[in-house]
C-alpha cells in the first residue's frame, strides 16, 4: 500500500480525551477515531491489525475442532428471562442495551450469547452421538458501560471472539476447558504478548470455575496477585491468602470502656494502644435482590482486613432463594438517607456490635426483618477481642465468641487478599502484585443454562440429561490495544511482528530524487512478492516527518533509500531496538524475510 493513497492522518499532540499511552498512540497514529462516548471507528491500519489478531484466534480455535458460526446481535428478552439474567443485565449490572420494537417486544443488543447458543442447542442437539461440540464466532458486542474509557479497552462497542461448548458430562467439559486454555495461551504467545493466566470470579456469567488471561501492563485496570514459584495467580477479586497472624490481646477481662472519637479502626487502635488485629469490626451493608427485596447484612471481620465486595456478593447470591430471588442487583454501605427507609431507630455507626439487634430494622414486604449475619474466617478464632458496644463513644474489650457474643452460623471468606500476604499453598511464599488487562476469560458453566432453558440430550441409556456447557471469550479489539500498552516508547508504537499492520515500510526521503524513487519502487514490489507486507511512504513530505510517522505508527522494519544508496546499500532500522544497519540492496528482501519468519 502507498501512503500517498491511504487515508492516513497523524497527530503531533496527545488528544485531551486519552488517558493511557495506548489510547493516545492509537489516536495520534491514525489507527482509530472517536465517534462518540465509547464508540470508535477502526481505520485502515487498525483494521489490518484486527484482521491479523482474528486470524490467529481463528486458526487456534479451528485447531481444537471448534466450528465458526455467526449469531444474531439482536436477542429476544424471552431467552434472557428463561435463564434469569434479563434483570441482572438490564437492571443490576445494567450493561445491556435494551430496546422495544414497533410491536413493543423487548430486545437486547448482545453483550454475550449464552442464551442464544443454548436455544440453538435445545433445538438441534438430541443425542450423545452429536457431542461434544464447540461453536464460536468473532463479532461486534455491545455493553452500556457506565464510564467508557481508555479507548478500545472499555468501549460500548467492541469486537470479541466467544465460544460455547457442549459436553455429555463434567469430565468432557474439563477436557474442552483444557483445550481452550491451551488455545488461549497459544493465541497470546503468537500475538507476542507477556501474560498471566489467573483464577477469576465468574460474575454474572456464573458456573463452577473460571480463569482470566491478563496481559501485563502498568495501566491495567485489574490487580493480579501471584507467587514467585508459579503455582498461584488470581485476580484480586478471587484471590485467597493467609492474613498476618493476630497479636496477643492485652485485654484479659471483659469490660465496657468509653472510647470517644474512635469511629475508625485506626483511631481506636491508637486510643487503646492495641493492634488492629485484636479488633472485630462490624460492617453494615444493604443488599437489593432482583425481586426488589432489601436485606441488611452485618459482616464481622478483623480490624486490619478489608471486605472484598465481589466475594460478599457471591455469598449473598447463594442466599437469594431464601428471599425468592435469583441474584443481587445492588450492594452498598447505606448512607443516612438510605437508612431512613428501614431504620427503626438511630444506628450507632462506628460503634456497632456483632449482636446488633434485629429491632433496628423496620421490616415490610420489601425489607427483610432480620439481619443476614456473616462472620469472616479471620475472626472466628479471635479471643479477648475489642468490638463495638452498640453505643456511640463506647467499645467492649476482652470479648469472646460463645460468651459475650454468639458466633454467627455463616462462616465465610470475604476478606480482600493483598500483596505481602502468605500463600495458602505454601506459607513460605508471599503474594506479589502486578497490573493486568483482562483480554480473555474462560468458564466452566456446567448445567446452569441448560437446566434453566431445558437444553437436554439423550444418553446411551436412553435417559434425558442436561447438556454440560462451557464458554470462552477473548476480546479481539482489546487485545490489539493491549499489545500497544505493553510495547511502546517515547516515539510511538512498537507492534509485535505477528499483528503489525505491515511488516515493513520503505521510506523515500526525497521523492524528487529519481534513483531513490526507482530503488524504492522496485524494492516495494519485490518485498510484497516475497510475502512481506510492505508500505511505501511516497508522500511529498520532509524526510524528518516521514521518519517520525514511521516510528509513531510502529511498523517493525523501516527501509530507507537514503545516503547509503550511493554505496549500493540501504539503511534498515528495527523499530523495537532502533538498531540501524546498512545492507546491500540485493540482500534486503532475503534479510527482512528471515527476520519476519523468525518473529512469527
From Swiss-Prot:
InterPro entries: aa-tRNA-synt_IIb (IPR002314), aa-tRNA-synth_II (IPR006195), aa-tRNA-synth_II/BPL/LPL (IPR045864), Anticodon-bd (IPR004154), Anticodon-bd_dom_sf (IPR036621), Cro/C1-type_HTH (IPR001387), Pro-tRNA-ligase_IIa (IPR002316), Pro-tRNA-synth_IIa_bac-type (IPR004500)
Catalyzed reaction equations: tRNA(Pro) + L-proline + ATP = L-prolyl-tRNA(Pro) + AMP + diphosphate
EC number: 6.1.1.15
GO biological process, one term: prolyl-tRNA aminoacylation
Chief subcellular location: cytoplasm
Subcellular location: Cytoplasm
Gene Ontology CC annotation, any one: cytosol
KW Metal-binding (keyword) present: no
UniProt keyword annotations, A-Z: Aminoacyl-tRNA synthetase, ATP-binding, Cytoplasm, Ligase, Nucleotide-binding, Protein biosynthesis
Assembly and binders: Homodimer.
HAMAP family given in the database record: Pro_tRNA_synth_type1
Domains as described in the record: Consists of three domains: the N-terminal catalytic domain, the editing domain and the C-terminal anticodon-binding domain.
Name of this chain's protein: Proline--tRNA ligase
Gene name as annotated: proS
Amino acid at each position: 500500500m502507498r501512503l500517498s493513497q491511504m487515508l492516513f492522518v497523524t497527530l503531533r499532540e496527545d488528544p485531551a480525551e486519552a488517558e493511557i499511552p495506548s489510547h493516545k498512540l492509537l489516536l495520534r497514529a491514525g489507527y482509530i477515531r472517536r465517534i462518540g462516548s465509547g464508540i470508535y471507528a477502526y481505520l485502515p491500519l487498525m483494521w489490518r491489525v484486527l484482521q491479523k489478531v482474528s486470524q490467529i484466534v481463528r486458526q487456534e480455535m479451528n485447531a481444537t475442532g471448534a466450528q465458526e458460526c455467526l449469531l444474531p446481535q439482536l436477542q429476544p428478552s424471552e431467552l434472557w428471562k428463561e435463564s434469569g439474567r434479563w434483570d441482572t443485565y438490564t437492571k443490576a449490572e445494567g450493561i445491556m442495551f435494551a430496546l422495544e420494537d414497533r410491536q413493543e417486544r423487548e430486545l437486547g443488543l448482545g453483550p454475550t450469547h449464552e442464551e442464544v447458543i443454548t436455544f440453538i442447542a435445545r433445538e438441534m442437539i438430541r443425542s450423545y452421538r452429536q457431542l461434544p461440540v464447540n461453536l464460536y464466532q468473532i463479532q461486534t458486542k455491545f455493553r452500556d458501560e457506565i464510564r467508557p474509557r481508555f479507548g478500545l479497552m472499555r468501549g460500548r462497542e467492541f469486537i470479541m471472539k466467544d465460544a460455547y461448548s457442549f459436553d455429555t458430562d463434567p469430565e468432557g467439559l474439563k477436557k474442552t476447558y483444557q483445550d481452550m486454555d491451551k488455545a488461549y495461551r497459544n493465541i497470546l504467545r503468537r500475538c507476542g504478548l507477556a501474560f498471566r493466566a489467573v483464577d477469576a470470579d465468574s460474575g454474572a456469567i456464573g458456573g463452577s470455575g473460571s480463569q482470566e488471561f491478563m496481559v501485563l501492563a502498568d495501566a491495567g485496570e485489574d490487580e493480579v496477585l501471584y507467587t514467585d514459584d508459579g503455582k498461584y495467580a488470581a485476580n484480586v477479586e478471587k484471590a485467597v491468602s493467609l492474613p498476618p497472624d493476630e497479636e496477643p490481646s492485652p485485654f484479659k477481662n471483659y469490660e465496657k470502656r468509653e472510647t470517644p472519637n474512635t469511629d475508625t479502626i485506626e483511631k481506636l487502635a491508637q486510643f487503646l494502644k492495641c493492634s488492629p488485629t485484636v479488633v472485630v469490626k462490624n460492617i453494615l451493608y444493604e443488599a437489593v435482590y432482583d425481586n426488589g427485596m432489601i436485606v441488611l447484612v452485618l459482616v464481622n471481620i478483623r480490624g486490619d482486613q478489608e471486605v472484598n465486595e465481589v466475594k460478599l456478593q457471591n455469598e449473598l447470591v447463594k442466599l437469594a432463594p431464601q428471599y425468592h430471588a435469583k441474584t443481587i442487583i445492588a450492594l452498598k454501605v447505606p448512607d443516612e438517607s438510605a437508612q431512613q427507609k428501614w431504620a427503626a431507630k438511630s444506628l450507632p455507626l462506628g460503634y456497632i456490635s456483632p449482636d446488633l439487634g434485629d429491632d433496628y430494622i423496620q421490616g415490610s414486604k420489601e425489607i427483610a426483618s432480620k439481619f443476614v449475619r456473616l462472620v469472616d474466617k479471620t475472626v472466628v478464632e479471635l479471643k479477648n477481642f475489642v468490638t463495638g458496644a452498640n453505643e456511640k463513644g463506647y467499645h467492649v474489650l476482652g470479648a469472646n465468641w460463645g460468651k459475650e457474643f454468639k458466633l454467627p452460623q455463616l462462616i465465610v471468606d470475604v476478606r480482600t487478599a493483598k500483596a505481602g500476604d502468605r500463600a495458602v499453598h505454601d506459607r513460605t511464599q508471599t503474594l506479589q502484585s502486578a497490573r493486568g488487562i483482562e483480554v480473555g476469560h474462560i468458564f466452566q458453566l456446567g448445567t446452569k443454562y441448560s437446566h434453566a432453558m431445558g437444553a437436554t440430550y439423550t444418553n446411551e441409556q436412553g435417559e434425558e440429561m442436561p447438556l454440560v456447557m462451557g464458554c470462552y471469550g477473548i476480546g479481539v479489539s482489546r487485545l490489539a490495544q493491549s499489545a500497544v500498552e505493553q510495547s511502546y516508547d517515547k516515539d510511538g508504537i512498537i507492534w509485535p511482528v505477528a499483528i503489525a499492520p505491515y511488516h515493513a515500510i520503505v521510506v523515500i526521503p526525497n521523492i524528487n530524487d529519481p534513483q531513490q524513487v526507482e530503488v524504492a519502487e522496485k524494492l516495494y514490489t519485490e518485498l510484497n512478492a516475497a510475502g512481506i507486507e510492505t508500505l511505501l511512504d511516497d508522500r511529498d513530505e520532509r524526510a524528518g516527518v516521514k521518519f517520525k510517522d514511521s516510528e509513531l505508527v510502529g511498523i517493525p522494519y523501516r527501509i530507507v533509500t537514503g545516503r547509503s544508496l550511493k554505496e549500493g546499500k540501504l539503511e534498515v532500522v528495527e523499530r523495537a531496538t532502533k538498531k540501524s544497519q546498512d545492507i546491500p540492496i540485493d540482500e534486503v528482501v532475503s534479510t527482512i524475510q528471515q527476520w519476519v519468519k523468525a518473529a512469527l
